[in-house]
Amino acid sequence: MIKPPLKSRKKIKKNIIEGVAHIHASFNNTIVTISDRQGNALSWATSGGVGFKGSRKSTPFAAQVAAEHAGRAALEYGVKNLEIRVKGPGPGRDSAVRALNATGFKITSITDVTPVPHNGCRPPKKRRI
């Protein structure tokens, strides 16, 4: 039985002027997603996806490269203005914001959306090194 050919997802050329950059900076990796105002992802990149492995993923330089990669892909959609939302305590927070600024976007606002518990779950035990 012959399988029908898989439909490739072609990039639809949209003209989106305003976007939202979500930067999730954990201690091990940095994920940068650029979406439109409704939350539909336009482009994304991670520190591991752009070629860094192991402990080098958690460096500020890896977050900078990931933000540049996601930013260049979002420029193809016509994104000009960015609202930045940063989540997490990782080392790539500031360098990812600087990289998006250097890519040529006009940054309208920077918001910290790190979730803070109102004394919810018990945190993991402290590390003894």
Curated annotation (Swiss-Prot):
NCBIfam families: PRK05309.1 (NF003698), uS11_bact (TIGR03632). Signal peptide: none annotated. InterPro entries: Ribosomal_uS11, Ribosomal_uS11_bac-type, Ribosomal_uS11_CS, Ribosomal_uS11_sf. Located on the platform of the 30S subunit, it bridges several disparate RNA helices of the 16S rRNA. Forms part of the Shine-Dalgarno cleft in the 70S ribosome. Part of the 30S ribosomal subunit. Interacts with proteins S7 and S18. Binds to IF-3. PROSITE patterns: RIBOSOMAL_S11. It holds the Pfam family Ribosomal_S11. It comes from Nitrosomonas eutropha (strain DSM 101675 / C91 / Nm57). Belongs to the universal ribosomal protein uS11 family. GO terms for molecular function: rRNA binding; structural constituent of ribosome. This is Small ribosomal subunit protein uS11. GO terms for cellular component: ribonucleoprotein complex; ribosome. One of its GO terms (biological process) is translation. Keywords: Ribonucleoprotein, Ribosomal protein, RNA-binding, rRNA-binding.
